[in-house]
């Protein structure tokens, strides 16, 4: 009886010692998309660029933080330019050529992100500002006194 317990304990420890089977990651194939939509969300702290097809399915995205900028450097126009160039390069791998651009937010990276998209080789058909403007909704944060 003691032998049975030891063999079952040895069998269970042997199963634990083995590494679990590695999951095979399935690489997504290249889509063939010609027209897309670029959403630029530019806040005071970061700039996020998302590129979708006309249905709203995300093709690629990038942000200043994802490109390695930290802290106050994320809110600079140069960080927005790098993020936009990265997102455009990823999207152009899927065949994207023509884009409509929707810009949201008051941040510093709005114009530089637009210029980076054009410099990457995307043809910009439309630029629209979709910044939400309240009809006197929530109270604004108090002004900073430095």
Swiss-Prot record:
GO terms for molecular function: rRNA binding; structural constituent of ribosome. GO terms for biological process: translation. SUPFAM superfamilies: Translational machinery components (SSF53137). InterPro entries: Ribosomal_uS11 (IPR001971), Ribosomal_uS11_bac-type (IPR019981), Ribosomal_uS11_CS (IPR018102), Ribosomal_uS11_sf (IPR036967). It comes from the Bacteria. Pfam families: Ribosomal_S11 (PF00411). Keywords: Ribonucleoprotein, Ribosomal protein, RNA-binding, rRNA-binding. One of its GO terms (cellular component) is ribosome. Residues 1-28 are annotated as: Disordered. The keyword Amino-acid biosynthesis does not apply. PANTHER family: 40S RIBOSOMAL PROTEIN S14/30S RIBOSOMAL PROTEIN S11. Part of the 30S ribosomal subunit. Interacts with proteins S7 and S18. Binds to IF-3. This is Small ribosomal subunit protein uS11.
